[in-house]
Structure formats: structure tokens, C-alpha cells
């Protein structure tokens, strides 16, 4: 396997990247940042996917594995969610991922290019910094749970995700299918926070903050910060982490791909904490 660097806005670099390649794993995307105009996110996540599909087909690529996101489903009412759960994207990133996924599926059908789509859940582990703020706030003692903490959230350790993605590229039964890739089971936010606290040898505060006023505060922060191109210190999507359930079944990936996550929550969070510490981040 070869890691290719390029620009999804530059077809010439894409052609160079796929030349002589049998299989493409498309994992590049623009993520959530306030300074990024929404049309730029669409240009990267949707048009960039279209361009990569076209040059891959022209180059004779035999399989195209596309990274989507469980975020296309939004909150999961009556969990667990499955690959067939309705789409309900909640922001620009999720909407572009949903559009790109449909585009990839339709392109495969129209042009005969074998497409495999995977939707990862919350990815954590070495080299991922999205959960660093949570670790820091727990370690420093300033963390306060927003809401009850009983909302379900499902995560996947990065090495387990890599195993699942490789199976998407090698399984004979994968083409034409969509797979949710996440850990074996969801956990409450209380459990996740308590497990992080154990990695740091600290006790969590039992004090909780009501979710509704924090959500309103997030909306106000967005109203003030977004016109200025500033990342809000608090925004509704962050509060939604504490409010909306995201729990999924991986039964399809287990049965079709033989997917079997190996790293449980306690081990994965400890490995993540150790990496943060080794990098001087925590």
C-alpha cells in the first residue's frame, strides 16, 4: 500500500496519484473549521470526490474504497443505528459527506467501478487530537458533564479502524456495499469520562451543567464569531456531543467482512493518553 499526497482541487495531482494503481482508498476530506468557507468544503468533499472517481475510472482502478461518516445519520433515535438508518446530517461537513457518498454509489453503478463505502464512528488513538481537549479538561479538574451523561456514544480505536478499512479493500463480498465501522459497543458519556479520569489518576466532579442553556450559549457564540471567521469557543455541534445519541450496530461488517475490533475502551483510552503524554501534549 502507498500513501499518496495531493490536492483534491487539482485533477493533475489526482491523475498522478492513481497512475498504475489497482485500488484507491479515498480518506481525504475537509473537516469542521470556521475559517473554511462552506463552498470550499463542498469543493473538496464533493467535487473532489467526483474528480477522484473520474480519474480513477480513467486509470483502470479495480476498486474504490470511500470514507464517509456515521455523521450522515445525525442523532440515532432508538439505537442502534444501521447502514439503513435514514440520513439526517446536522452541519455542512455531514451534508457534504452524505452528498459525496451518494455520488460515489451512483458513479459505481453508472460506470461499473466497484465501490465500497465505510462510515467510521468517533475515531481516537495516537495522532488524533480531537479528544485532547477532553483529556486535558478531565486531567485539570475543570471538566463538567453537560446534561445527564447517559447519552450513548460509540468510538473506534484507530488500529481497529485500519483493520476494517483494509477488509473493505480485500473482501470479495464488499463491492457495492456500505459498512459502519466502530467499536463493538457504545458507552455512556459518563463511562467515557470516568475511564479517561482513570488514565489520569483523578476523580471526576459530580457537578453537572444543564444542557439547554449551554446550547443557547453555543448559538450565541456562533452568531458573534462566525461573521468574523473565528472558531467559536463553544458551538452547538459541541453541545450536541452531550445531547444526541450515536450508537450503532456493526453486525453487517462482522458478518460480511469478518470485522472484529480488538481494542476495548479502557485499553484504547490508556494508549491514547500515553501517546498524548509522550508528545508532551498532556
Annotate the PLM regions.
Residues 44-49, 65-68, 96-97, 154:
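Short alpha-helix in the Rossmann-fold core of NAD(P)-dependent oxidoreductases
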Residues 73-74, 113-132:
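Flexible, glycine-rich beta-alpha linker
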Residues 90-119:
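Active-site Tyr-X1-5-Lys
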Amino acid at each position: 500500500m502507498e500513501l499518496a499526497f495531493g490536492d483534491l482541487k487539482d485533477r493533475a495531482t489526482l491523475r498522478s496519484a492513481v497512475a498504475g494503481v489497482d485500488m484507491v482508498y479515498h480518506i481525504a476530506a475537509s473537516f469542521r473549521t470556521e475559517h473554511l468557507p462552506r463552498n470550499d468544503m463542498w469543493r473538496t468533499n464533493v467535487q473532489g470526490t467526483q474528480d477522484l472517481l473520474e480519474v480513477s475510472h480513467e486509470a483502470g482502478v479495480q476498486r474504490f474504497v470511500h470514507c464517509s461518516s456515521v455523521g450522515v445519520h445525525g442523532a440515532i433515535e432508538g439505537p442502534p443505528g444501521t447502514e439503513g438508518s435514514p440520513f439526517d446530517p446536522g452541519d455542512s461537513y455531514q451534508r457534504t459527506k452524505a452528498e459525496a457518498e451518494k455520488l460515489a454509489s451512483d458513479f459505481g453503478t453508472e460506470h461499473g467501478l466497484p465501490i465500497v463505502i465505510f462510515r467510521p464512528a468517533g475515531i481516537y488513538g495516537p495522532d488524533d487530537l480531537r479528544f485532547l481537549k477532553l483529556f486535558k479538561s478531565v486531567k485539570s479538574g475543570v471538566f463538567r458533564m453537560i446534561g445527564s451523561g447517559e447519552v450513548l456514544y460509540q468510538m473506534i480505536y484507530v488500529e481497529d479502524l485500519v483493520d476494517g478499512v483494509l477488509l473493505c479493500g480485500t473482501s470479495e463480498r464488499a463491492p457495492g456495499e456500505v459498512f459502519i465501522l466502530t467499536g463493538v459497543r457504545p458507552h455512556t458519556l459518563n463511562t467515557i469520562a470516568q475511564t479517561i479520569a482513570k488514565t489520569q489518576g483523578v476523580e471526576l466532579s459530580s457537578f453537572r451543567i444543564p444542557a439547554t442553556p449551554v446550547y443557547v450559549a453555543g448559538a450565541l457564540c456562533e452568531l458573534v464569531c462566525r461573521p468574523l471567521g473565528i472558531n467559536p469557543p463553544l458551538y452547538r455541534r459541541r453541545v450536541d456531543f452531550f445531547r444526541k445519541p450515536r450508537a450503532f450496530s456493526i453486525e453487517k461488517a462482522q458478518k460480511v467482512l469478518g470485522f472484529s475490533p480488538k481494542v476495548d475502551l479502557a485499553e484504547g483510552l490508556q494508549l491514547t493518553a500515553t501517546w498524548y503524554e509522550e508528545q508532551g501534549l498532556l
